[in-house]
């Protein structure tokens, strides 16, 4: 293991070529076997299913060796009853090779990690979600257009084989990978990532996620260098920033004696506002420029996917949002950049005055209509807000009923506490109070008025007052105008972070624990 780690440090290019050394070197089979047999490793035990009782890395290696000795031009397809590539039962060898492909790729990633994956807490595992909001709070107000990109999903196994071809230098390994992907097409073909996870079996879910993440990495690895080159290049203005060329030409004619320092001045004058955020199968590119520049970006992105991956990209997968007119939905929020006049007081010798300064500000809003629709879906109320009692909870104690409603409210409020306006959240709290009171009234066979008189202020606010004081303390007492507005204390991912617009063909997960 130490030798493999040292070799990885000597040549960093090997970290993305792990399939070749891990599947076709002697000592790494021992590493993978130790990693697989160790119960404390990050891999899940695979002994629950009957197919994995026959699994062994020695059998996998022998089957791969037999594959290498065959004619590589023969490719098995889904409709074949007999796998000619291995000469024996198709399902037996494909399951063995699939098991090896599932277990072995996790070895180099676990070596690169300082701590085992099972020791990582929830905050560490979801830290990337936390970093998205401060980035947007700082960068989005300086942008005026958003490219909302849905990463196109794979439609054919050969697309993945072509991407692996650049990293794997052994042709027989590509044929073995092709045979597995053709037989298990449901691992890569789906309408969205959630459906991909649901279709894949329990044993193959890790491989499905690995293939999807590798494909997403390929998309980003070829685009991010272009963005960095665009934002950090020191080339002439007419080569990089066509919109500002007339302005720079005027500078050349007016300030001729600054010609030697013109290039350095352009470094400070140019516009590098290009920001990229990705979550799951959705990417956001924030741009500052003209509408023509944004259309060019969409045109080039479309051509990139069509030419590089031989994949047709539907036009609706790259949507242009103008921040000045509309917002966009991301991670369960409605995000926009609105013009807000900050209060600035200036004092002079004669008399003080307040100038009017118009600046853009980041405006996150909670989607109240969507949250109310989620309450309707979970049968807490109807579409008009009329409450329903939870008859299934009437057999619980009063404290359990209060705790369940209180947990629902805290989950909603903690995640959406970064909203600039919280009137809609308090409206959600008022709607949830009524089903809570009605459930208790059905249990005690009394009226809602009697329940309110009995529980008083403890109704649905059993543990909320202390949290409300701690959450609003930065906003009401100690927060200055220069501080961030994002004080949300999220400790786990809320299902409401998934986008909800039906026109984007995305699925909404339930918000509440049943």
Curated annotation (Swiss-Prot):
Cross-referenced PANTHER family: MATURASE K
InterPro entries (alphabetical): Domain_X, Maturase_MatK, Maturase_MatK_N
Entry annotated with the keyword RNA-binding: yes
GO molecular function list: RNA binding
Cellular component terms per the entry's GO annotation: chloroplast
Localization per Swiss-Prot or TrEMBL: Plastid, Chloroplast
Protein function: Usually encoded in the trnK tRNA gene intron. Probably assists in splicing its own and other chloroplast group II introns.
Keywords: Chloroplast, mRNA processing, Plastid, RNA-binding, tRNA processing
Domain of life, per lineage: Eukaryota
Broad class of the protein's primary localization: plastid
The keyword Plastid belongs to this UniProt entry's keyword annotation: yes
GO biological process: mRNA processing; RNA splicing; tRNA processing
Annotated protein name in UniProt: Maturase K
Family to which this protein belongs: Belongs to the intron maturase 2 family. MatK subfamily.
